[in-house]
Amino acid sequence: VGVALTRIPQRPTDAAPPSPAPETSYIAAGSLTGRTILVDPGHGGYDGGARCRDSGVWEKEVNLAVALAVEKSLTRRGATVLMTRRTDTDLCDDTTRPANVTKKRQDMQCRVDMAVQGQADMVLSIHMNEYRVRSESGPQVFYRAGSGAGRLLAGTMQEALITALSPQKERAAMPGDYFI
C-alpha cells in the first residue's frame, strides 16, 4: 500500500486565505469539518498499474476500492472529499491533448489541476506497489518534503497501517516530491 500525501499550497488569488491551524489539526481524532481533501485512486482506464502475479488483479481496481472506503471515512469525519475518479477511467482527453504531451502526463496534470481548482487542503494519492520479494512488501506513506503537517500526518497514517496490517516489513513514512 502506498499513500502519497501532498499539501496543496496554491489557492486562487481571489480566495480568502484559510484560517491558520496548528499542524496537528490534520491528525486530530475529531472532526475534519472545513477541510477539503482530494482522494486520488492511482491509475485507472488505460493505465492498470501493477498486476498481482497470484490473482491477476490490477492495481487500479484495488486503488479505487480503497479510495471509495477512504472517502466514506473522511466524509463521516466532516471533510469535503473530492475524488479524481469513481470508476475505471483515466483523466485524459485525447481531443484536447497537445501532440507533445503524453497521455500519462496529461492524466497526472489533470489530477493536480483538480486539487488546485478544488482548493484541496490535502491530496491522498493511493497506490498498491508491487515488490518482487514478498518480505519487502508493506504499506508506506509518503509526504511532501518540507511539510511539517505532512510529516506528522504521514507518520500517524504509517503507524495505523502497520497496526492494522501487521506487515512483515515495517516501513517508515518518507518525504518525496511526487507528481501525482
Model-derived features: positions:
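Catalytic-site microenvironment of enzymes
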Residues: V1-I180
